[in-house]
Amino acid sequence: MARKTPIERYRNIGICAHVDAGKTTTTERVLFYTGLSHKIGEVHDGAATMDWMEQEQERGITITSAATTCFWAGMQQQFDQHRVNIIDTPGHVDFTIEVERSLRVLDGAVVVLCGSSGVQPQTETVWRQANKYEVPRMVFVNKMDRAGANFERVVKQLKDRLGATPVPLQMTIGAEDEFKGVVDLVKMKSIIWNEADQGMTFEYQEIPADLQEKCAKLREQLVEAAAEANDDYMNKYLEEGELTEEEIKAGIRARTLANEIVPVLGGSAFKNKGVQAVLDAVIEYLPSPTEVKAIEGILDDGETVAVRKSDDNEPFSALAFKIATDPFVGTLTFIRVYSGVLESGTGVYNPVKSKKERIGRMVQMHSNNREEIKEVRAGDIAAMIGLKDVTTGDTLCDPNNIITLERMEFPDPVISVAVEPKSKADQEKMGIALGKLAQEDPSFRVKTDEETGQTIISGMGELHLDIIVDRMRREFKVEANIGKPQVAYREAIRNTCEIEGKFVRQSGGRGQYGHVWIKFEPRAEGEGLEFVNEIVGGVVPKEYVPAIQKGIEEQMQNGILAGYPLLALKATVFDGSYHDVDSNEMAFKIAASMATKQLAGKGGAVLLEPIMKVEVVTPEENMGDVVGDLNRRRGLIQGMDESVSGKVVNAEVPLAEMFGYATDLRSATQGRATYTMEFAQYAEAPNNVAEAIISARSK
């Protein structure tokens, strides 16, 4: 089968935003105008097509990122048919992992901001993640019909709060109830959408007199930004003071792809104004798969770095970026194809698990509807049905050209709760349900507490775990009780010290002998164990060194103070001794573990607690109560700000003090204040807190 759409006409984009900026509504409108969904789904009545899990529709927030394919040829059919793959990403702080995972496989992003609340904490998080993956992006200032909406203020926030270089391609006409349409600064014409047909048609008009001066100034900035793309444009602009429409678009495109500027558009998705212009801008200013940096991976030898270009003739390679459980077909594995072609019925190799998989059915998703396809090609986003051993972040590749694309990094959970099935019948079902949910979501972990036998689930926040338990009930029909949330404390050492670990056991016949000297140091950067082998002269044979490392690692997991894992440690093994007959790997592992245990005293061990970055938006009259309450929770106020919706308080607060905060804040402010919270870092717990935790653990 030949390719239906040339790869240059593909756009793989994500629509990212803060909760409530109107992202799902924007995506809905995109699907409506591209002709796929005939009745516009509204989030307000729980009918949006992208939000396909029951819970999302109830809570009105997007949880899973569904991938949807649609086609667009321009507002005036001015382009050839383009294929736009949209990945809808959640904006809630507890689901940051979903956003990170989507950005990893996107080529470009549309960041939706609310015209009245502008740049919010989650926007900053998404922006940082997009910078990490070097994703070119544009901004859609939505909800221009809302009270307090102000396009220019949001543009200024992009510069001040995100350090971006925003370039408005439009100016909005009016705001709030008076919002009429936008001025296209490239054409210097107003665009007014027809309300009678839900904005399907529009007309160009002259710019309103009261906006002409402002638009002329913005137009000049736009042309200047385009001229900086190359010397030819710059020289022409300096000589003639103008560029053609084509040159402006080419200049803006080149600089957007280079991540130098961020084009900004405005509108109101809910009022059917501005979304088609966003689609045009996606085609004109965001990259095709061939215009982004080719993906790199490691070949089968585990060392050689190789590149896979976005080309059908290259060997097949793809990344599994999401696993979802579908009520009708079972497990869906969403993949982004980076290179080559794959037909259903053929085999692929998963180098991360060292397993072959046979591809059965493949589908392309439109939100919750699916279309069976026979093949996927470079640039495609599709879902595979029934893959057995694939988890998020795994590579799938041609078995004859093995490559491992870079793995995604997932943060460790910061909160845990014990869950218990309500009945014996739920016991088995709960195990299956939790296993499936953990496979879908790498930031969610399940383990059994060895001492109590309880099942412990861990995640990124209270809402995250609420939704997991809710999904167990709805999708898997498992009823469960939940314990009190537990904080994921960590341990660390303050001092550098040299410790001897010696394990000797003689009991007739063959004994055990392991002896090591290890220098332990706190690690300044990174997490986990940094292990250095400085043994010389064969005082400990090198085949025992991996066992020494394993002994240290296992003890780090079990902790030295209160049974919490050690966050970071540098260990250098520099001396020791062995016995020809009695030494073995087990003896050295135990010796290393014994040395690590002694860190509790000699290493100046301390307890670390997770600190959260909290932002509260509150009416001015409740400001004193909010700040007082945060101080009571051992919070450190980092700063205060003004926003349209009230005062903004930024603080860093220990997670242990934040349980039940939503309820307390609601009652203190009659439900008028809102807050967001995300993990910031681990910090040393004060003595009185640490002592209470250590004594509770040792009972």
Swiss-Prot record:
Chain ranges passing through the membrane: none
InterPro entries with a match to the protein in the record: EFG_II (IPR041095), EFG_III (IPR009022), EFG_III/V (IPR035647), EFG_IV (IPR047872), EFG_V (IPR035649), EFG_V-like (IPR000640), EFTu-like_2 (IPR004161), G_TR_CS (IPR031157)
Record-level Gene Ontology MF annotations: GTP binding; GTPase activity; guanosine tetraphosphate binding; translation elongation factor activity
The keyword Protein biosynthesis appears for this protein: yes
Stored SMART domains: EFG_C, EFG_IV
Superkingdom classification of source: Bacteria
Keywords, comma-separated and alphabetical: Cytoplasm, Elongation factor, GTP-binding, Nucleotide-binding, Protein biosynthesis
Annotated binding of GTP, by residue: 17-24, 88-92, 142-145
Domain tr-type G: 8-290
PROSITE patterns assigned: G_TR_1, G_TR_2
Annotated GO CC locations: cytoplasm
Subcellular location: Cytoplasm
GO biological process, one term: ribosome disassembly
NCBIfam families per UniProt: EF-G, PRK12740.1-5, small_GTP
Known role: Catalyzes the GTP-dependent ribosomal translocation step during translation elongation. During this step, the ribosome changes from the pre-translocational (PRE) to the post-translocational (POST) state as the newly formed A-site-bound peptidyl-tRNA and P-site-bound deacylated tRNA move to the P and E sites, respectively. Catalyzes the coordinated movement of the two tRNA molecules, the mRNA and conformational changes in the ribosome.
Protein family: Belongs to the TRAFAC class translation factor GTPase superfamily. Classic translation factor GTPase family. EF-G/EF-2 subfamily.
Name of the protein in question: Elongation factor G 1
Origin species: Hahella chejuensis (strain KCTC 2396)
